[in-house]
């Protein structure tokens, strides 16, 4: 027993010595004259050969900083700001436009409430809550299904740049249709206005579906270095330009741009109330014009990667092999993914993808790892179907709740802005306050913990909605039929801001971590498509919301809030149990990826194989 304890005490020192010897050995083998170890994207007097890849010892010892970020990256973020500002400014007023009937005394017939009506909301078509909920959910559903097409086109056929260009075109046409739908003649003929609105919704969804999955990957493409690089400063100090931290900074700026744009929907909320819907729909189009202008200016400075058609071809072939034969048995015994590994295929005598046509196997073992990681990520994404419902996924119900409360001259759809405002405030607090504090005390706030914590916080927003809706029913002059009551309940609508604040706080943990996992566990050539797979969860949420639309009416609205809140909390518990060892799985995946990289490099050097495979996945987009 004494001997065993002694060995256990000394083992870390032995491991450390062996590790240090290994690093020294690897450093000795490092070729400082090999041009492959240098990048000439940046050259100066202190770095005459360019930036250099770090040795293993340098990777552990040198100070790490954020690398040079091109101004074109920030210009693309401005494009995202303008696109999201126009999108949210439009969608934020759709509920009032569709649900509420125009007041007979509305000035000029534009939909604004008459002067002297502090608690009245703007209205136009008067189609009711169910129609408003159905169409807003249709917009959400289509806006997050079209990215699957946009991601495929961006990765495999027309490329990301052309996909974005077509998205801009469809988006501009959509804003024109919204303006046509808001003129007095269209509002007076509610069916005509509704038809124009539906066309605009479909067109806007197509534009968003082409832009959204391709713009963020294009932004990340602008970072010049593919790996960590060593830079010598004028002081003589050598530092590492950390690719992970640099991509994290870019992504945070991008995410901040999204929410600043979303916050600007406050302008259209007041436009619809003070003037009418034509101005409320015209302002987003003006914002949208920024997008093509900035894209035209920044185009010559962009690094645009061509589409890689072979990627999707290989994915389809791999899936065909995986689901051939008795795949159910392989799923059961844990050999499902091994079946498509070229090494396993050769071992069982399969040297062609298609024996009859003698089609060659065009992928490597690492392809299987990449696709497996993508599918594993999608398992987590499935939980976001419920999360999105809690995260203002039933926006029409929340807007309707606020409309039944005392507004005191504030537009009922203004409160949606508490979501982006909370994110704008909270993200810097997390990045520069909470997370560094946790690191100081060596508390590892693991990805699965962040996601589950976000789910719990977001579920509290629906519990708050349950309490408020119950209070409205109890205090409204119309009792449990308060939605369309002419007199509001004597409860200040500002209390409803808690719904949006809590949901946004949950989003800061759950959403940003999901982006991180999506990009960490997917090959770069499939970034757009994997991002689209995450977005499509919102489409499933919208479909589920459409399914429960018949229940979205008095006197049952408070039970809807409670059910979604409890479902979100339950998802957090189940997901934590299922993915408790997620960090260990990710570490094993990283080790497996490095092993496959070494094997393929050795085989290529020996001339055994010449296989194109994806470059390494982005390590993280959020630290």
Curated annotation (Swiss-Prot):
The chain crosses the membrane at residues 134-154, 163-183, 191-211, 250-270, 277-297, 385-405, 418-438, 448-468, 499-519, 529-549, 557-577. Keywords: Membrane, Peptide transport, Protein transport, Transmembrane, Transmembrane helix, Transport. PROSITE patterns: PTR2_1 (PS01022), PTR2_2 (PS01023). It is a multi-pass membrane protein. It is found in: Membrane. SUPFAM superfamilies: MFS general substrate transporter. One of its GO terms (biological process) is protein transport. One of its GO terms (cellular component) is membrane. Residues 1-20, 31-58 are annotated as: Disordered. The keyword Membrane applies. PANTHER family: OLIGOPEPTIDE TRANSPORTER-RELATED (PTHR11654). Uptake of small peptides. Belongs to the major facilitator superfamily. Proton-dependent oligopeptide transporter (POT/PTR) (TC 2.A.17) family. This is Peptide transporter PTR2. The gene is PTR2.
């Amino acid at each position: 027993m004494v001997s065993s304890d002694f060995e256990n005490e000394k083992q870390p020192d032995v491991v450390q010595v062996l590790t240090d010897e290994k690093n020294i050995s690897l450093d000795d083998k490092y070729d400082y004259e090999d041009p492959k170890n240098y990048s000439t994207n940046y050259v100066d007097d202190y770095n005459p050969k360019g930036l250099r890849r770090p040795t293993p010892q340098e990777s552990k010892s040198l100070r790490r900083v954020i690398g040079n970020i091109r101004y074109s990256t920030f210009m693309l973020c401005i494009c995202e700001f303008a696109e999201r500002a126009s999108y949210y400014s439009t969608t934020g007023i759709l509920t009032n436009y569709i649900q509420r009937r125009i007041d007979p005394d509305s000035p000029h017939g534009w939909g604004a409430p008459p002067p002297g009506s502090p608690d009245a909301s703007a209205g136009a078509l008067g189609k009711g809550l169910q129609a408003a909920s159905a169409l807003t959910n249709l917009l959400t559903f289509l806006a997050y299904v079209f990215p699957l097409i946009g991601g495929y086109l961006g990765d495999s056929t027309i490329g990301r740049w052309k996909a974005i260009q077509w998205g801009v075109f469809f988006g501009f046409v959509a804003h024109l249709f919204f303006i046509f739908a808001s003129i007095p003649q269209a509002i007076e003929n509610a069916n005509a206005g509704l038809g124009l609105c539906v066309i605009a919704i479909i067109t806007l969804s197509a534009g968003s579906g082409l832009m959204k999955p391709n713009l963020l990957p294009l932004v990340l493409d602008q970072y010049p270095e593919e790996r960590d690089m060593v830079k010598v400063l004028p002081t003589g100090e050598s530092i590492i330009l950390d690719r992970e931290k640099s991509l994290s900074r870019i992504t945070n700026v991008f995410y901040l741009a999204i929410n600043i744009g979303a916050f600007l929907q406050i302008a259209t909320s007041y436009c619809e109330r003070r003037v009418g819907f034509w101005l409320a729909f015209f302002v987003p189009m003006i914002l949208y014009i920024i997008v093509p202008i900035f894209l035209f200016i920044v185009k010559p400075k962009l690094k645009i990667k061509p589409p890689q058609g072979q990627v999707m071809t290989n994915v389809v072939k791999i899936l065909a092999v995986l689901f051939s034969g008795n795949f159910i048995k392989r799923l059961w015994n844990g050999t499902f993914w091994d079946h498509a590994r070229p090494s396993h295929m050769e071992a069982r005598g399969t040297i062609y993808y298609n024996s009859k046509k003698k089609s060659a196997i065009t992928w490597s073992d690492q392809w299987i790892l990449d696709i497996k990681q993508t599918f594993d990520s999608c398992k987590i994404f499935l939980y976001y179907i419920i999360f999105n419902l809690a995260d203002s996924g039933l926006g029409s119900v929340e807007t309707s709740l606020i409309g039944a409360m005392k507004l005191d001259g504030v537009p009922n759809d203004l409160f949606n802005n508490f979501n982006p405002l909370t994110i704008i405030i909270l993200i810097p607090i997390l990045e520069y306050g909470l997370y560094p504090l946790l690191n100081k005390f060596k508390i590892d706030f693991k990805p699965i913990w962040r996601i589950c914590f976000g789910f719990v916080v977001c579920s509290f927003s629906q519990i708050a909605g349950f309490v408020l809706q119950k209070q409205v029913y109890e205090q409204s002059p119309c009792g449990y039929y308060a939605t369309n009551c002419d007199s509001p309940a004597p409860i200040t609508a500002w209390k409803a801001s808690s719904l949006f604040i809590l949901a946004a706080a949950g989003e800061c943990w759950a959403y940003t971590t999901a982006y991180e996992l999506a990009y960490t566990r997917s090959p770069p050539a499939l970034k757009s498509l994997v991002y689209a797979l995450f977005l499509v969860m919102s489409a499933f949420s919208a479909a589920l919301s459409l399914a429960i639309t018949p229940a979205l009416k008095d006197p049952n609205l408070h039970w809807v809030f409670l059910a979604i809140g409890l479902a979100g909390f339950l998802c957090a518990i189940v997901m934590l149990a299922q993915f408790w060892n997620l960090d260990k799985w990710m570490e094993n995946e990283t080790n497996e990826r490095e092993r496959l990289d070494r094997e393929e490099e050795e085989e290529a050097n020996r001339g055994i194989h010449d296989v194109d495979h994806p470059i390494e996945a982005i390590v993280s987009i959020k630290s």
